[in-house]
Each structure stands twice: as structure tokens, then as C-alpha cells.
Regions:
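Conserved sequence signature across two-component system core domains
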Residues: 9-10, 33, 51
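Two-component/phosphorelay signaling modules centered on CheY-like receiver
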Residues: 13-31
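Acidic catalytic/metal-coordinating carboxylates
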Residues: 35-38, 60-64
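Short amphipathic alpha-helix used as the core "switch/output" element in two-component signaling
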Residues: 41, 63-75
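Active-site beta3 strand of CheY-like receiver
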Residues: 46-52
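Active-site residues of response regulator receiver
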Residues: 54, 82
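Receiver (REC) domain active-site loop signature in two-component systems and cognate sites
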Residues: 57
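Short, flexible helix-to-coil linker/hinge segments that flank and couple to helix-turn-helix
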Residues: 90-94, 99, 105-150
Length: 151
């Protein structure tokens, strides 16, 4: 097991279970929470290395919680695990301080590579997002450029 400490945040118990199973024996899960306010409290108290969280959560969404944590000096790296594929969410996530963006349907294939990349301060974006952006535009895109090594 690697010594990296991970805090999970998602309001869907099935997602928490799936992520826990994927990470079992590989990383230390220090806590799991189901809303943005609890995320802020536990991240401040437990000082994890990595946050794996959803965007859409009650009380405070993941993007707002990430902005708050970064503002108060949290050193935790952030990976969003979400169903949101549109560019506005992606840009907001990275603007808030995320380094990773994994689509929930690709959780089983993308989460571990995303964690490895993000823990090395690299950016990771699920491939379907990159493919869609490439289809829309023939010119280089900042999101595509950041994720090019993950295609």
C-alpha cells in the first residue's frame, strides 16, 4: 500500500463503495463524506494528500469546496469524479485547483491512472472528454494539451 492519504466525497453511496474497492490495499482512505461542508471540515482536520470528489453534492458543491480549501491553504491535490462532461464544468474544476477530471462511467479504467498522474503533479482528463474537444476544434486546446499524455 502506498502511503498517500485520500479523502473521498460523493453523495452517492454506490460511488463511494466503488472508489473504496478500487483503492483498497493501494492507498489509505482517511474518510468519506457525502457533502461539501463535511469535505471542508474533514480535509482541514485530516490533511489528506488527495481529494477524490464529486462536483454535485449537497450543502456545497465540490468546486466551491475546492475553492475554499485552496483559499485557506490546503495542500491536497484534487481529482473530480463526475458525470459532467461539458466544458464549463471542466474549466471551473481546473480553475478551482483540480488536477484531475474523471468521468463516472470511466471510473474503473481511469481512476488509478488519474491518481498516479495527479500525485506527481500532472494533469489527467478522461479520454472521452479529450476526444470530444478534438472533434469540435481543429486547433490545440488547453484541456487537450494538459491531458495529451493520457490519450
Amino acid at each position: 500500500m502506498e502511503s498517500h492519504r485520500i479523502l473521498l466525497a460523493d453523495d452517492e453511496p454506490a460511488v463511494i463503495r466503488a472508489v473504496t474497492q478500487l483503492l483498497d490495499g493501494k492507498f489509505e482512505i482517511v474518510a468519506s463524506v457525502d457533502n461539501g461542508q463535511s469535505l471542508i471540515e474533514d480535509a482541514s482536520r485530516l490533511d489528506p494528500d488527495l481529494l477524490v470528489l464529486d462536483i454535485s453534492m449537497p450543502m456545497m458543491n465540490g468546486i466551491e469546496a475546492t475553492r475554499h480549501l485552496k483559499k485557506v491553504g490546503s495542500r491536497a491535490k484534487v481529482i473530480f469524479v463526475t458525470v459532467h462532461e461539458d466544458r464549463d464544468f471542466i474549466e471551473a474544476a481546473f480553475s478551482a485547483g483540480a488536477l484531475g477530471y474523471v468521468l463516472k462511467p470511466r471510473l474503473a479504467t481511469d481512476l488509478l491512472p488519474a491518481i498516479r498522474e495527479v500525485l506527481q503533479d500532472h494533469t489527467f482528463v478522461s479520454s472521452p472528454i479529450c476526444m470530444e474537444e478534438a472533434r469540435k476544434s481543429g486547433r490545440p486546446d488547453p484541456i487537450l494539451e494538459a491531458a495529451r499524455s493520457n490519450l
